[in-house]
C-alpha cells in the first residue's frame, strides 16, 4: 500500500511540475519584441491569496522587462519589485499590467513577488485553498 501511494505521489509531482514548465514556455513567448529571455525564470504552484518570491540579479545599464503569467483559475497576479532593503520599486496592484519595464543604474539584486488574488468565497464553491494554479515570472533584457 505504501508503494502505491509513493508511486502516485511521484507521478502527480511530475505532472504538476510539467504544467508549470509549460506555462513558463508560453510566458517566454509573450515577453515581447526586442527582449531576450535572460534565463532567470521561476515557476511554482500557488493557491489564492498566497505569495511567491524570488531574487534575481540585474546588471548596470541594462533595460529589463519582468513579465508574469498565471493559470486562468487564479486570475490577474499582483507583481511587486523591491530591493533587498524591501523598498518598493513597482507594484501593479489595480492597474492590470502583467509586465514591468525598467533600466538599472547599478548592479543589484531585486526581490520579485507574485501574489495570487484572493477571491470572495461563495458557499456553493470549493474553498479558496482548493484552487491551485501555476504562476511564473520571466526576466528579459532588451537587445
What are these model-derived regions, one by one?
Residues 20-35, 115-143:
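C-terminal edge strands of extracellular/lumenal beta-sandwich accessory domains
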Residues 33, 38, 87-91:
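Local beta-strand/beta-hairpin segments that build beta-sheet-rich folds
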Residues 20, 45-122, 141-143:
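Acidic, Ser/Thr/Pro-rich low-complexity intrinsically disordered segments
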Amino acid at each position: 500500500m505504501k508503494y502505491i501511494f509513493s508511486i502516485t505521489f511521484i507521478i502527480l509531482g511530475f505532472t504538476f511540475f510539467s504544467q508549470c514548465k509549460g506555462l513558463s514556455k508560453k510566458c517566454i513567448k509573450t515577453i515581447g519584441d526586442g527582449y531576450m529571455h535572460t534565463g532567470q525564470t521561476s515557476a511554482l504552484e500557488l493557491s489564492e491569496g498566497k505569495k511567491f518570491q524570488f531574487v534575481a540579479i540585474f546588471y548596470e545599464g541594462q533595460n529589463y522587462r519582468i513579465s508574469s503569467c498565471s493559470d486562468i483559475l487564479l486570475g490577474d497576479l499582483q507583481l511587486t519589485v523591491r530591493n533587498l532593503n524591501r523598498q518598493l520599486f513597482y507594484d501593479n496592484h489595480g492597474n492590470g499590467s502583467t509586465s514591468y519595464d525598467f533600466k538599472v543604474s547599478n548592479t543589484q539584486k531585486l526581490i520579485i513577488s507574485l501574489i495570487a488574488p484572493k477571491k470572495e468565497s461563495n458557499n456553493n464553491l470549493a474553498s479558496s485553498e482548493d484552487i491551485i494554479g501555476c504562476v511564473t515570472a520571466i526576466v528579459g533584457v532588451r537587445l
